[in-house]
Amino acid sequence: MKSKLKKYKKFLWILVIVIGISLLLFPTVSSFVNRQKSNDEIDSYNKAVSELTDDNKNNMEQNAEKYNQTGDSNYYNALNLGEIISYIEIPKINVYLPIYNDTSEKTLSVAIGHLEKTSLPIGGKGTHCVLTGHSGLTTNKLFTDLDKLSVGDTFTLHTLDEKLVYKVTTIEIILPEDVYYNCELDKDQCTLVTCTPIGVNTHRLCVRGERVLNNED
């Protein structure tokens, strides 16, 4: 009887240790899995872009330009290549994430969302694209490190086969109702938005960039 009780207690201790280790590793493992999923989605997007004919690509660009200028083009079809319309790369904070054409909670838990009614991410003077992402998730970093960016840093949007490079010009923390995304005729802008402080989420961190020449061009 004592032998069985001893074995039972030993089993319980092992179980507690296994559960504890699992809980400790869960955020790291989940983050790794989500990052791999994002990489796979971006690879699929690039493959789909490479298979587009020039006519198809031109039509998509024209539809996106029409939407940006007038809002008349079908938003969900303008850059439709599956769920992803572009992807963002921010080397300084190790961000490499797909961009979806919605800002639902489901999307923002795994990727970056494009804010409807703002310019689609194709660039051009008089455009202002707004991208939103969560911060502080235990399973996915997303825009958690956005506050580490400084004025002068750059980020890149990859849309179709174009690389749109933006240099950070302003960083501000404001109330949600004060977030603005007006277009300026002579500027090509993109703003990255996330909630702050992490876990409180009463304000918005807005990192705005202006388009600069891509050194690879």
What are these model-derived regions, one by one?
Residues 1-2:
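Short, Lys/Arg-rich, polar N-terminal cytosolic tail immediately upstream
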